[in-house]
């Protein structure tokens, strides 16, 4: 899995937070502590990745069951680990290009270019997934199947 990149520039904000619970002895008299938190109001990231069927067959033993477990993990990775530091992170779409042969039927970059993400909110900053339109061009080479897992 490659590093994800934001679709649009992101703008971090800094907010001040007050903690009512005392975290150390020197703050006992104050009864609270102040802190700062960096947030990004909204961002949509695109990540791309690869599974080498050839290596799985010859070296790693990575199976179809392992792959299905991986897809399930990607889809649900933030569902059972909510945190204020991550806000409402969630997977929104999972497009898989499945090749008919272990060495592939098409170069990956050509397939990744088939997934397009466009802003629909005009000049306003995006604030939700609804501010984007995701399309998948289904005109793909023979031997490749498009699967939308999410």
Name the predicted role of every residue range.
Residues 2-150:
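Basic polyanion-binding and macromolecular-assembly surfaces
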């Amino acid at each position: 899995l490659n590093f994800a990149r934001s679709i649009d520039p992101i703008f971090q904000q800094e907010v001040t937070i007050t903690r009512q619970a005392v975290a150390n002895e020197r703050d006992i008299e104050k009864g609270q502590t102040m802190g700062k938190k960096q947030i990004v109001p909204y961002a949509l990231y695109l990540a791309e990745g690869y599974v080498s069927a050839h290596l799985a067959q010859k070296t790693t033993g990575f199976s179809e069951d392992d792959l299905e477990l991986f897809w399930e993990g990607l889809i649900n990775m933030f569902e059972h680990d909510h945190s204020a530091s991550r806000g409402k992170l969630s997977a929104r779409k999972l497009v898989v290009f499945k090749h008919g042969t272990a060495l592939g039927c098409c170069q990956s970059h050509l397939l990744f270019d088939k997934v397009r993400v466009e802003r629909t909110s005009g000049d306003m900053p995006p604030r939700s997934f609804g501010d984007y339109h995701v399309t998948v061009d289904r005109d793909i080479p023979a031997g490749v199947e498009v699967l939308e897992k999410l």
